[in-house]
A protein has these predicted regions:
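TPR/TPR-like (Sel1-like) alpha-helical repeat modules
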Residues: 6-11, 109-117, 139-159, 165-173
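Short coil turns that delineate tetratricopeptide repeat
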Residues: 13, 51, 85, 119-122, ...
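TPR alpha-solenoid repeat register
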Residues: 56, 90, 124-127, 160-161
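Residue-level signature for tetratricopeptide repeat
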Residues: 63, 96-97, 134, 167
Length: 173
């Protein structure tokens, strides 16, 4: 798994570095291209990478996380975000990494970015779920409960009930 991803990265990385004229991005859909151009208003001409290299990097991040190599995982997910700053999967993976690194502000950053580019109900719900986690981490159970409720409008993850119980316990209920 990881060795194959490292080989893909090693073979493709030099070809997709930005130049003075072009910025190279790895969009999964035409909608992501449109979101990127509207949100970031790039000064350089945008050239699309012909493979989902951002996806390779976030999968690589996931593998590194499983091995406890969090610093390397952070570098990988940051590169994924450079290649496609409007890919919701990148920010979902980023949030999971920040949870493991016990970095609440990183979780909030990932949620903020995710809500900018979320296009499905599940992605919106997962952003609210991670916001709920963030507010639990900073000991604000009222906001955590409100955001968990928002999550439930769009998406009910497997952990929904256990998170609700945790927040209820924090509130003394």
């Amino acid at each position: 798994g990881i060795k194959i991803l490292e080989e893909i990265i090693r073979n493709n990385l030099p070809a997709w570095n930005d130049t003075s004229e072009f910025t190279y991005k790895s969009f999964g859909t035409p909608l992501e291209y449109l979101l990127y151009t509207k949100l970031y208003e790039p000064e350089k001409e945008v050239k699309s990478v012909n493979c989902n290299l951002a996806g390779v990097y976030w999968m690589y991040c996931h593998g590194l996380m499983k091995k406890g190599r969090y610093d390397e995982a952070l570098a990988a997910i940051e590169r994924a975000a450079e290649l496609n700053p409007v890919d919701p999967d990148v920010y979902l993976q980023y949030a999971e990494l920040m949870k493991l690194r016990k970095n609440p502000e990183g979780i909030k950053f990932a949620c903020d970015k995710l809500l900018q580019c979320a296009v499905t109900k599940e992605q919106i719900g997962r952003a609210y779920f991670n916001y709920s986690y963030y507010f639990s981490e900073i000991n604000d159970p009222i906001k955590a409960a409100a955001l968990l409720e928002m999550c439930g409008i769009f998406y009910k993850p497997d952990l929904y009930e256990s998170e609700l119980q945790y927040i209820s316990n924090c509130l003394g209920m």
